[in-house]
């Protein structure tokens, strides 16, 4: 059975960079954000339950009405919880099918900014947190998203703190533009490949 690696971190930490490195090394990575958007369009359970929650107009001509869904989600914290309760279980099921479809592969990854918040931690064996200092993250996100510092800070403040993520992580990768990244990834993979008993499973 494949070892499942959860990759998480805050906005601008560089999760996608680590995921790409793993894929280059032959370890496929399930990008939960992309896959969640896909199955929201295609999964009958999600479509039915979102229609029940938000109304039939949440899908127009077969396409997700994103402005309406966003308006519903941001209208109340309870609304966001209800939408997540519809989508997240289906993402978990999709991830399990995806892993099965990979056959006898040694390792797979799951990238998710909300790995811990969404309960995806229970789907993986080990959690890797990608860490970068706050200022580095803010500058990266501003450049990437063409956004303002104020908006980026609001998004960061809405996320789980780095301290909490670190407490749940089995391994922390520092991506601060100074510490070499590849040796850290290689070290982590080597530990899992040869001596995975040195790390505590995320499920324990």
Swiss-Prot record:
Q: Where would I find the DPCK domain in this sequence? A: 4-203
Q: Which UniProt keywords apply?
A: ATP-binding, Coenzyme A biosynthesis, Cytoplasm, Kinase, Nucleotide-binding, Transferase
Q: State where the protein is found.
A: Cytoplasm
Query: What EC number(s) are associated with this protein in UniProt?
Result: 2.7.1.24
Q: Identify the CDD domains for this entry.
A: DPCK (cd02022)
- Keyword field contains Lipid biosynthesis: no
Q: Function of this protein?
A: Catalyzes the phosphorylation of the 3'-hydroxyl group of dephosphocoenzyme A to form coenzyme A.
Protein name listed in UniProt? Dephospho-CoA kinase
Species whose genome carries this gene: Bacteroides thetaiotaomicron (strain ATCC 29148 / DSM 2079 / JCM 5827 / CCUG 10774 / NCTC 10582 / VPI-5482 / E50)
Lineage of origin: Bacteria, Pseudomonadati, Bacteroidota, Bacteroidia, Bacteroidales
């Amino acid at each position: 059975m494949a070892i499942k690696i959860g990759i998480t971190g805050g906005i601008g930490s560089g999760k996608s960079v680590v995921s790409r490195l793993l894929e280059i090394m032959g370890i496929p990575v399930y990008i939960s954000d992309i896959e969640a958007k896909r199955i929201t369009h295609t999964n009958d359970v999600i479509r039915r339950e979102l229609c029940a929650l938000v109304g039939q107009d949440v899908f127009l001509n077969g396409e997700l009405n994103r402005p309406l869904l966003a308006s519903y989600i941001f209208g109340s914290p309870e609304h966001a919880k209800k939408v997540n309760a519809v989508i997240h279980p289906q993402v978990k099921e999709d991830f399990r099918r995806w892993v099965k479809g990979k056959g006898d592969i040694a390792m797979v990854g799951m990238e998710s900014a909300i790995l811990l918040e969404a309960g995806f931690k229970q789907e993986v064996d080990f959690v890797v947190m990608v860490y970068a200092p706050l200022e580095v993250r803010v500058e990266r996100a501003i450049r990437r998203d063409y956004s303002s510092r104020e908006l980026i800070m609001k998004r960061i403040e809405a996320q789980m703190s780095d301290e909490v993520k670190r407490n749940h992580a089995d391994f922390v990768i520092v991506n601060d533009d100074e510490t070499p990244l590849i040796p850290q990834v290689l070290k982590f993979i080597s530990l899992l490949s040869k001596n995975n008993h040195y790390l505590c499973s995320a499920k324990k």
